[in-house]
């Protein structure tokens, strides 16, 4: 799955430089990291649910996940500060490119009723957030062996300075954005 990184350096890099009239190659936006996050939801007090989340994340990303804990106490969710909530993995370099290729070529096509990614999911700084309602769109997660279907969030952090640069970068990489109406 190295072809996505190769595609970036051979085609996308030059197209971005020409499109935005960048003078220096260091100005061209690139993907710096991908953060994958999954929570146990209302089962966060259950230690087995947290372990299942960490196992699923490790299977999906190929890297060991670490626990995330609550920053604040919330009585409505029966959550106390420091209580484990889920897991998180930060991917960089080759693992990042492999995971993005898996998302593009395997996970997104398996999403039911997919109508394109929302361009509104950019944060204002060129970073893109993508959510999956079901983790079973990834081939490593089999429906028979999981206790509960959980969703996960994928945050693509770029070096883009604004949303237009980030959008063009991901669009040229092949991310299927929904057409503006």
UniProtKB/Swiss-Prot annotation:
One of its GO terms (biological process) is translation. It comes from the Bacteria. Keywords: Ribonucleoprotein, Ribosomal protein, RNA-binding, rRNA-binding, tRNA-binding. One of its GO terms (molecular function) is rRNA binding. The keyword Metal-binding does not apply. It holds the Pfam family Ribosomal_L5_C. GO terms for cellular component: ribonucleoprotein complex; ribosome. PANTHER family: 60S RIBOSOMAL PROTEIN L11-RELATED. Belongs to the universal ribosomal protein uL5 family. This is one of the proteins that bind and probably mediate the attachment of the 5S RNA into the large ribosomal subunit, where it forms part of the central protuberance. In the 70S ribosome it contacts protein S13 of the 30S subunit (bridge B1b), connecting the 2 subunits; this bridge is implicated in subunit movement. Contacts the P site tRNA; the 5S rRNA and some of its associated proteins might help stabilize positioning of ribosome-bound tRNAs. Part of the 50S ribosomal subunit; part of the 5S rRNA/L5/L18/L25 subcomplex. Contacts the 5S rRNA and the P site tRNA. Forms a bridge to the 30S subunit in the 70S ribosome. This is Large ribosomal subunit protein uL5. The gene is rplE.
């Amino acid at each position: 799955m190295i072809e996505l990184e190769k595609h970036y350096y051979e085609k996308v890099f030059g197209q971005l430089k020409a499109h935005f009239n960048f003078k220096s190659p260091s100005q061209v936006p690139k993907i710096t990291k991908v953060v994958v996050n999954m929570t146990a939801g209302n089962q966060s007090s259950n230690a087995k649910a947290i372990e299942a989340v960490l196992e699923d994340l490790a299977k999906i990303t190929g890297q060991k996940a670490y626990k995330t804990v609550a920053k604040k106490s919330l009585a409505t969710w029966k959550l106390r500060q420091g209580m484990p909530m889920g897991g998180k993995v930060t991917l960089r370099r080759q693992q990042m490119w492999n995971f993005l290729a898996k998302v593009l070529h395997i996970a997104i096509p398996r999403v039911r009723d997919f109508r394109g990614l929302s361009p509104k999911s950019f944060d204002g700084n060129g970073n893109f957030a993508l959510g999956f309602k079901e983790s079973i769109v990834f081939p490593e997660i089999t429906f028979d062996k999981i206790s509960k279907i959980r969703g996960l969030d994928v945050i693509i952090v770029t070096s883009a300075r604004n949303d237009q640069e980030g959008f063009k970068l991901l669009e040229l990489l092949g991310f299927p954005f929904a057409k503006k109406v």
